[in-house]
Amino acid sequence: MNFFSKLFNLKQNNHNRDTNSDCNNFYLNELECGLTPGQLILIDWTQKTGRNYNFPRYFKYSLQIDPESTHNQLYKLGYFTKNKTLSYLTVVELKTILSKHNLATSGKKAELITRIINNVNIDNLDIPFEFKLTKEAQNLIIEHSDYIKAYYDKDITMEDYCKEKNNISFKATFGDIKWSLLNKQAHRNTVSGDFGCLSNTRKAQGRHLEQEGNIKHALTQIIHTSLN
């Protein structure tokens, strides 16, 4: 943990708040990309994992989707391609396949996989699928990466980010919109006299400045927070 992280005492990500299952219309409505927040995050998650199983709980409790059925819907809509893969299997499982086909079972995992590919028709094997994003899905993730950043951000919510983005008349960056949100939050904390929350907001501003590479102002924020 670096110097700034220790001083700012980082908190858990927003997406880990999966205990509140109250209905939130924001997560049920489509974003400008034509997908719900849950669908967009699920596409990003699939890009990172390649899986269609072992979904995190936040898909159901925070994003309010059934990840398994939603994943299947997105596949049918052409956001994913799928191919059988040996990479998810354990060494023991790979050796079992080799043994059944009377092939040598010695070697490291990469060697075992290569041996199977060279000697066995993997289409006939009962093995997992690996999902990859189509070009359309890749472009979608790139174009709307700011929403994904907002969902995983430690200091703002995706919902607040979306509202603030829609309220800004010019084309703002993710950093601009987040800074605007934090400034408004600091103002509300000051007006209400909630200086405990204000201190936390100032720390969030410092983290943001550090992430933006603005070290000078980040240090100023640290000093300002420490003196209050």
Question: Which residue ranges define each predicted feature?
Answer:
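Intrinsically disordered, low-complexity, charge-dense segments enriched in Lys/Arg
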Residues: 175-176
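Charge-rich, solvent-exposed alpha-helical interaction surfaces
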Residues: 3-6, 97, 115, 140, ...
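Amphipathic alpha-helical repeat scaffolds of TPR domains
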Residues: 157-170, 180-184, 195-211, 219-224, ...
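Basic helix-extension-helix modules of the SAP/HeH family
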Residues: 10, 22-168
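Short acidic, low-complexity intrinsically disordered linear motifs used
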Residues: 1-13, 105
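An N-terminally focused, membrane-permeabilizing/fusogenic/translocator signature enriched
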Residues: 16-20
